[in-house]
Amino acid sequence: NAAVAGAVIEGATLTFEVLQ
């Protein structure tokens, strides 16, 4: 659902930021 998709996007964004 939308909440899960939002959480996945947030997690991916956080991971991307950490890896920069």
UniProtKB/Swiss-Prot annotation:
This is Cytolysin tenebrosin-A. Residues 11-20 are annotated as: N-terminal region. Octamer or nonamer in membranes. Monomer in the soluble state. It is found in: Secreted; Nematocyst; Target cell membrane. One of its GO terms (cellular component) is other organism cell membrane. GO terms for molecular function: toxin activity. It comes from Actinia tenebrosa (Australian red waratah sea anemone). Transmembrane segments: none annotated. Composed of a long N-terminal alpha-helix and a core region rich in beta-sheet structures. Before the pore formation, the alpha-helix binds the lipid membrane, partitions into the lipid-water interface and stabilizes the monomeric molecule on the membrane. Finally, it traverses the bilayer, thus forming the transmembrane pore. Pore-forming protein that forms cations-selective hydrophilic pores of around 1 nm and causes cardiac stimulation and cytolysis. Pore formation is a multi-step process that involves specific recognition of membrane sphingomyelin (but neither cholesterol nor phosphatidylcholine) using aromatic rich region and adjacent phosphocholine (POC) binding site, firm binding to the membrane (mainly driven by hydrophobic interactions) accompanied by the transfer of the N-terminal region to the lipid-water interface and finally pore formation after oligomerization of monomers. Keywords: Cytolysis, Ion transport, Membrane, Nematocyst, Secreted, Target cell membrane, Target membrane, Toxin, Transmembrane, Transport. Belongs to the actinoporin family. Sea anemone subfamily. GO terms for biological process: killing of cells of another organism; monoatomic ion transport. Residues 3-12 are annotated as: Plays an important role in the hemolytic activity.
